[in-house]
Amino acid sequence: MYEHLGPLGGGPPNENHIALYSTWARGKWGIIITGNVQVSSSHLSLGADLVLPSMHGPYDIKPWATLAAAMHAASPGDTPSLALMQLNHTGRQSPRFVGGRAPWNAPLAPSSKRVGSNLNESFISRMMYWLLFHEPRIMTEEDIDTAVAQFCFGAKIAKEAGFDGVQLHGSHGCEFHHLSNLSTKPPQISSPSSCHQRCVITLLITVETHAE
């Protein structure tokens, strides 16, 4: 899910997010999950994302703690919902113009396959894909290590803010999915011969995130 409630360029939760999730908190839901919280500020989806602070400097936990509290704010007498933060790296689906990078800078992805490049579409559709999405820059091992660290840092932020857990966004198109996908995995990772090998990075992110 994507709320489109942040400023252009993304940022922490604001009063619009608090109002939305406070309303949902009174709905007697068992679990409430945030929209995708981007672990990389240079890989946004539609430009107004929730974005984690940098791993490499001081940060303000208050906006995230306020969001967690809002998600737990059930009506009197009701059991509070569990609050999960959904962590995401948009990868190759981060668009040219509102993706958090200069329009000429390509996003990082496990392979150089551009969004829409393997579809049998009309000429106009192919041109639209070309206009909206760059051919990605293939991730190095260092880039992969950074992505793992970013997910783990997100888990740390979630725990510190008072969330009950995290959800790792693994749907089609996003980095977490592509890292273990046979057709879009990084070329430096040997061809998987078993389910365990295909999911080695997924498992690494999961284990390291759980450790946080």
Model-assigned labels for residue ranges:
Residues 1-4, 37-44, 172-173, 180-185, ...:
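Short connector loops/turns at beta-strand edges and beta->alpha or beta->beta junctions
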Residues 1-90, 97-99, 136, 147, ...:
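N-terminal capping/small domains of soluble enzymes
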Residues 14, 54, 134-144, 148, ...:
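Active-site oxyanion-binding pockets that recognize sulfate/phosphate
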Residues 32-36, 80-87, 161-175, 212:
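Short beta-strand segments at enzyme active-site cores
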Residues 49-81, 179-212:
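Alpha-helix-loop-beta-strand connector modules within alpha/beta enzyme cores
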Residues 63, 67, 140-143, 147-150, ...:
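General structural feature for long, well-ordered alpha-helical segments within catalytic domains
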Residues 72, 80-82, 88-157, 161:
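Non-globular sequence segments
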Residues 94-100, 177-181, 199:
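Short acidic, glycine/serine/threonine-rich loops at helix termini
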